[in-house]
Amino acid sequence: PTNISVEEGNNTFIIDGGWVVNKKTNTLFGAVNVKQNKTRTVIHDLPNYIDHIGMYAFSYCIDLTEITIPKCVVSIGESSFDQCEKLETIALPSGITSIGVGAFGECTSLKHIDFGTDVSYIGTAAFFACINLATPSFYKTKIEIIHGNSFWGCNQFRTVEFPSTLNRVEDQAFAMCKNLNTLVFNSDQLIIENGAFTYCKNLRRLVFTKGKPISIGTTMFNEDGKTPDGKCFITYLYDTNGE
């Protein structure tokens, strides 16, 4: 559809300043004028009371470069900014707890994002192929699982330090991060699945500050289960005691 309308007396949805909002959950679903929204470059007029950005709310807004997220927002929905190719930076409110599946997938111009301290969930492929994204500050979050393909192809990542809450890194979570060099893990209950860092050709150093992981997949780096791709051997694999 090119336009969305809400009938008078609707008990669930309202239109507020050109935006469609579920008034029961304070979820923003998108713009009334869908076609016009796809061509906007800057958005600073979202309702200031919304708590959630809904699924696909801004997906394929290929000209969007900048958006202000209201301070009370706590979750970014599935594919909400999928393929916003020109979006360069986004400031997430400090209270954000959840970033949905594919939320920023293929935002190829995205350079910076700050998770804040309350994020505990990042969905599968949330930042898939964000090839210009600088390494976010994972360390201060409450993330427990890095889901598959979450950061596939994030080529600007170099050193990543994970929070003590992390207990699992899933298959392909950081695959194709070609410049990733160092990983620092701060958990004593860690499982790294097969292929979690496949094709990370420059990965050289792993640090486990709380001792050895519970499990490391046999093909963590490469399909042969022996060495990282390109035969770039890991030069350090130790805990804080050097063991």
Can you name each region flagged by the protein language model?
Residues P1-W19, K23-H52, I62-S75, E85-S98, ...:
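Structural signature of tandem-repeat unit edges
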